[in-house]
Amino acid sequence: MVFKDGNDMELSDKDSRLFSRRAALAGAAGALALAGTGLMGCSVGGAGTGGASSASNELTDGQKKLHKQIVAVYDVEKQTAIKERLDAEHAAGGYSEAAPFVAQDPFGTDTLSCYVRFATTDSVTVSYTVAGRKKTGDTPKVATFSRTPRGGDTPATEHEFKVIGLIPNHKNKVTLTCTAQDGASRTSTFTVKTPALKGEEEERLAVTAGESNTPLADGLFAILGTDSSKLDFMYLYDNAGQIRGEVPIIGYRSHRLLFPGDGSMIMSVSTTKMAQINANGQVVNVWSTGDYELHHDYAFDDDGNLLVLASHAGSEADLDVDRAAADKDKGERVNVEDLVIKVDVTTGDVSLVVDLGDIFPDLKASAKVASDGDLDWIHINTIQWLGGGTVLLSSRETSTVIKLTDIYGTPTVDWLMGSPEFWTGSGFEDMLLQAQGDFSLNAGQHSVTYLPNDETTATGRYQVLLYDNNFGAAESYPKFDWGQLGAAVVTDYGKGTHSFGRIFTADENTRTYELVDQIAVPFSGYVSSAQSVGDSNSMLVASGQAKTFTEYDRYGLPIATYEMEAEKYIYRVYKYEL
């Protein structure tokens, strides 16, 4: 559900057996063979619907009350007051290693966490283990969960941290292990009661073991948005499919987590707010995107400021131009998704960095208005910072990866990875990288990721990972034949059988790119993600509209597959060591 910020409660809608890369790398012919085999468990919606749900958008009175509480969570002054209260309660109390100060999710940022604080007489490192749960009736067994908290690996006498991974609606037993500098360890325990989950997600996902013996990568799977018609959360699941975190957000999606390096994490919490949550669970910064609405993705630049994909130009004149193109009344906003803004994390200032309409004016002018009344002519869904004013952008509507340089000066196209037929007559034909080999081109790709290599980046060669939705369609350009992207590309949504996790090598010296790795996965015409995980070149691929994600080994064999009963789809799944 997309909620307006503040206390305004008005709501509006937005948006089995898996095959190895050995066969997929056979090119278009191999891809067609895979398509003929079919994939089990693929969820297919109507063309252009994005799998929209018919569920009611009405919240219960309890959910409305909870949403007001969630809005209050992202108020820095209120969070500061909570921290001051915790400090006072701790100072008043006689707490110790044997009887630590414990508060269950005092900041309201993770239902399955608690705040812990105590002192020791000697300098020790600290770790903790959350006890498991035995299987009883329909309640599944839950394994133990162990972590070293932020700063816990540094010997100290004062200890303040967050415990994560608690079991919902359960009296959790937590064991603390303190290790002295001579190596001697001692333990103490406490219990903390958690409430039931606040959202409607599953406590336990359905998990199917794959044929690979490669261990799953460490970390937690972050479900970064489901576009529910109810309340919105970021969910964290462990490798067994057990929920280990429930982070409430005001609305929309959390998109991805960014880590400044101080133990905190930064994520979007609504269409106009980014938030920073420190290692103890306290919201310490909230940045507004001002006259812009964020969407899809964001990244750090070299100075640690936020580059955010955005819609709606700040000036009324720019808005009028887009409204006129979309034939909308002056009072209506029009989503264009063609801007990159910068949010200064020190001052909070917001500035426009890139307007893609200025770079591709003829393309924008040729685009048709979408059925929802928006001018979604380029639909940027990923941004990757390469350093030195250079970014990679993923354009779903043009099925093109775009490299821009000098974004803080004169933004310039360095190269395009897309269809030569689509870009014919655009004036950017010379910017196209030439595909080497026999493979269908990307169609509607998402989750583009820059994978530098110390040995090759300096020579102008690097890898690009992405989720190829393999769905050629764009309301903005109805006359273009997307079948020209290759024989394997799906142009009829109802006939989609598979998408791909793909890795390309881009060579800027020869102005070419080649497909070096590919995994065929359940079809998802929209949303979805791919990520390189662990130390063994495994790939995590989420097919959002199929509501499934799988971790594959380096040979393309599935290690484990997870299924989620999302209302619409899973927007994106990334794995983080939290």
Regions found by a protein language model. Give the residues of each.
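Histidine-/acidic-rich catalytic cores in large beta-rich domains
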Residues: N57-R133, P155-E160, I164-K171, T175-L578
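Compositionally biased non-globular segments, especially hydrophobic aliphatic-rich helices
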Residues: A26-G27, G50
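Solvent-exposed serine/threonine-rich low-complexity stretches and specific carbohydrate-binding patches
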Residues: G137-T154
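Bacterial Sec signal peptide processing site at the extreme N-terminus
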Residues: G45-S53
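N-terminal secretory signal peptides
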Residues: M1-F19, G27-G38
